[in-house]
Amino acid sequence: MGIGISSESKESAKRSKELEKKLQEDAERDARTVKLLLLGAGESGKSTIVKQMKIIHKNGYSEQECMEFKAVIYSNTLQSILAIVKAMATLEIDYVNPRSAEDQQQLCAMANTLEDGSMTPELAEIIKRLWRDPGVQACFERASEYQLNDSAAYYLNDLDRIAAPGYVPNEQDVLHSRVKTTGIIETQFSFKDLHFRMFDVGGQRSERKKWIHCFEGVTCIIFCAALSAYDMVLVEDEEVNRMHESLHLFNSICNHKYFATTSIVLFLNKKDLFQEKVTKVHLSICFPEYTGPNTFEDAGNYIKNQFLDLNLKKEDKEIYSHMTCATDTQNVKFVFDAVTDIIIKENLKDCGLF
């Protein structure tokens, strides 16, 4: 009988030890788990950052995964040229090529009958001819006056490759593809001995009510704002400037009671498009009080300070900001490395080790 009790207590002690070990492992894993929330207005580049995490930290996209984006890429390309030709009527811009009016009619007819996400050789030729028309190019230059995908020129300039038989999208094609995010998308990866759980939440107004579910236990917020959106209006409300909306949103996030102790990193994104645009469109279109030089550096710093000045607790809370180009893998890799170092430093500070 004594032997039975002894082996039972041994078994119990063993179970207890295993449970203790598991609890310790869970606690260590939790301590190394970083919950990252990607927030920002619609079309600020959040989903592109998520794609970059897959490329940088999860072995990228396989050929099969790239092929899954083919229909999206064709759909983005078609929607872009349709948006431009539709805007030509609104902006009263004429075609230069006599054949273009007929091409436009054919384009619209084919768009209505073709299966979504497909590209026939005939359709590709029509799109190429229209894209070459100087009137279409003039309309494209005024893209901030209507809604057009940022990737329009990327795909339309490369239509020969994209429409070729046997086309397989590459990672850059995937990064430029655009699908509106609805709901919450979670991506997990490991880096610098940390386990990241990154949450991408739809940025358009109708999606924002879902954010509240993500707020608990957030380690760090990455807020994305498109620098190039300073002369653009919202898709969901054409009375509202996109930059003003972004500032309003950042203000509510930055000073929210939920995030009093949360690290906040500001990604001033689409710096490549901003650099191109700022030479043509003065920043005063968005900030009438701005009288400085319309250079990338001066105008970019002014926008950055507009965001940073919204922080009501500057003495307690530092906002870290980076100029980014979400489609540039090396840039995102460099910036995310810096963000991870901030997270590690903040964690050490919380533990009293820094």
UniProtKB/Swiss-Prot annotation:
Induction: By bitter compounds denatonium, quinine, strychnine, nicotine, atropine, quinacrine and caffeic acid in presence of taste membranes. Mg(2+) binds at residues 47, 181. SMART domains: G_alpha. One of its GO terms (biological process) is sensory perception of umami taste. Residues 173-181 are annotated as: G2 motif. GTP binds at residues 40-47, 175-181, 200-204, 269-272, 326. One of its GO terms (molecular function) is metal ion binding. Expressed in epithelial cells of taste buds of the circumvallate, foliate and fungiform. Detected in various region of the respiratory track. Expressed also in spermatozoa. It comes from the Eukaryota. Residues 1-26 are annotated as: Disordered. Residues 32-354 form the G-alpha domain. Residues 196-205 are annotated as: G3 motif. It is found in: Cytoplasm. Residues 8-26 have a biased composition (Basic and acidic residues). Residues 265-272 are annotated as: G4 motif. Residues 324-329 are annotated as: G5 motif. A lipid is attached at residue 2 (N-myristoyl glycine). G proteins are composed of 3 units; alpha, beta and gamma, respectively GNAT3, GNB1 and GNG13 for Gustducin heterotrimer for bitter taste transduction. The alpha chain contains the guanine nucleotide binding site. Component of the TAS2R14-GNAT3 complex, consisting of TAS2R14, GNAT3, GNB1 and GNG2; within the complex interacts with TAS2R14; this complex plays a role in the perception of bitterness. Gustducin heterotrimer may also be composed of GNAT3, GNB3 and GNG13. PANTHER family: GTP-BINDING PROTEIN ALPHA SUBUNIT, GUANINE NUCLEOTIDE-BINDING PROTEIN G(T) SUBUNIT ALPHA-3. Guanine nucleotide-binding protein (G protein) alpha subunit playing a prominent role in bitter and sweet taste transduction as well as in umami (monosodium glutamate, monopotassium glutamate, and inosine monophosphate) taste transduction. This is Guanine nucleotide-binding protein G(t) subunit alpha-3. The gene is GNAT3.
